Amino acid sequence: MNISNKTRYGLRSVVYLGINYEKENISIKEISDKEGISKRYLEQIFAELKKGGIINSTKGTKGGYFLTTKPSEITVSGIIKLLEGNLNVIQEIDDYNIEDLEYTIVNKVWNKMSQALIDAVDSITIEDIINDYNSLSRNMFYI
């Protein structure tokens, strides 16, 4: 399974909004500049995140984007599912016979891999990522 740039950038943007959760609204331009992501591409991603209820926006001079819920309540899996569609490691197969070898492999291998992936990203919140990032930032030494 390959995670698309859309999802990678979407997750980075949501984490950025999470870092600034209790501050002012954040403009797409700011995220674009700080994260090196095309403003146009971010606008497309933000439209999907907004439609999915992860973010919202306000207009005006102090306008911008913000998270609709606390970073501790947003899971990585929620963002991936919203932007990717699903977390299956292979495309779903509808037409195989229960007696086929493929059926056994799908159930023994691919479905278990998919479930392990889902379990992993279900357990990670945006707040977890922010805490790890802040911990790494505090431990950096500059010469």
Stretches with model-predicted labels:
Residues 54-62, 66-67:
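Beta-hairpin "wing" of winged helix-turn-helix
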Residues 40:
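Key DNA-contact positions within bacterial/archaeal DNA-binding proteins
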Residues 45-50:
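Basic amphipathic alpha-helical segments that dock to polyanions
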Residues 71-95:
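Conserved segment of winged-helix/HTH DNA-binding domains
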Residues 24-29:
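Short acidic, hydrophobic short linear motifs in intrinsically disordered regions
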Residues 30-35:
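A short alpha-helical element within helix-turn-helix/winged-helix DNA-binding domains
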Residues 95-143:
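C-terminal regulatory/oligomerization modules of transcriptional regulators
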Residues 10-22:
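Short amphipathic alpha-helical interface segments
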